Amino acid sequence: MKFTLAASGSRGDVEPFAALGLELQRRGHEVRIGVPPDMLRFVESAGLAAVAYGPDTQEFLARDTYSQWRQWWKILPPIKALQQLRQAWADMATDLKSLADGADLVMTGVVYQGVVANVAEYYGIPFGVLHFVPARVNGKIIPSLPSPLNRAILATVWRAHWLLAKKPEDAQRRELGLPKATSLSTRRIVKRGALEIQAYDELCFPGLAAEWAEYGDRRPFVGALTLELPTAADNEVLSWIAAGTPPIYFGFGSMPIVSPTDTVAMIAAACADLGERALISVKPKDLTQVPKFDHVKIVTSVSHAAVFPACRAVVHHGGAGTTAASLRAGVPTLILWIFIEQPVWAAQIKRLKVGAGRRFSATTQRSLAADLRTILAPQYATRAREVANRMSKPDESVNAAADLLEDKASRNKSRTRYQDC
């Protein structure tokens, strides 16, 4: 069979699609995968042929579009960000029409799901969405809030999303010869019976599966999808770890950090206060600029699967993939969140009693030392190991997701053949 995967975002958003694509390819299927231009080398190095799809993520971050949306009280930044959203939609619509031609199923992520849903409707093929956090309306996403309020917040978010995307979506549907949409893309996706794979562990959101029981097998939980690729630095880092006490890992993925130099200095000082070593991952462009300390090792990339279990604790931005890696590693976690869905994971880490969370911009040397002191208490390590034993295994998650896509596509092919008889 032929599968088209359309991914957008940073490595944390793209890697699950690459992991799924590799498994489908291993099973003998034809896989076409579109990724942001800056992710092409990464996906191809994993063993997949990829094409450019959508905006360059690093250029997006360099324009600081994230901060434009945070400056909601100013008019021009949101307008500029909206223009960028519409241009990205138009570009993706053009690219995807050719990428999905002849496919038996097309799959994407949540943010630009409407682009892909329209193309799937045009070709009359099944459609799937990978969810890295509970994005559909539910009452469980923020455990500290009442269920009705959680549902109201998510419903408002999706209505706002539709209003923002309505103009480029209308243009795309005209181009495809489809009727004008009169309801939210989320409603249309659900109505079409799309496969919405929840690529995180069910235990992170207790009660969610029961709340979504009406959707049957259309919202299955499989766990995080990852390639678990090794890096050239892994052996050296593991040797450094073995030569002393287990360090605390710090890394913030692709998130924009205003001053890497100040951040490294803050981390070094907080760890020195506690008598701890630090392993800090920085972007390659910052490697030569950040300060050096005897109790700190600076790296540009490590395998989370290889290194996290050897650390005393993990501090990160709260991306879904990194959160899953720290939970699977069985070590306490501190999430210093930066953007949109990351506070959700901070709240779940706290609810699971395996760590704590705080907004990155509100973090100081004193607060960091205090948060680390909290999560380094023995009960957090004990609880983290307990949770790790209940987490899905990476290979099981990828296999389960591939099984679901095969089943969805094959059932549609069988139905199509029957209708043609």
From Swiss-Prot:
GO biological processes: carbohydrate metabolic process; lipid glycosylation; vancomycin biosynthetic process
Protein's UniProt keywords contain Oxidoreductase: no
Recorded family membership: Belongs to the glycosyltransferase 28 family.
Full protein name: Uncharacterized glycosyltransferase ML2348
InterPro entries: EryCIII-like_C, Glycosyltransferase_28, GlycoTrans_28_N, UDP_glucos_trans
One Gene Ontology MF term: hexosyltransferase activity
Swiss-Prot/TrEMBL keywords: Glycosyltransferase, Transferase
CDD domains (alphabetical): GT1_Gtf-like (cd03784)
Name of a matching Pfam family: EryCIII-like_C
Membrane-spanning segments: none
EC number: 2.4.-.-
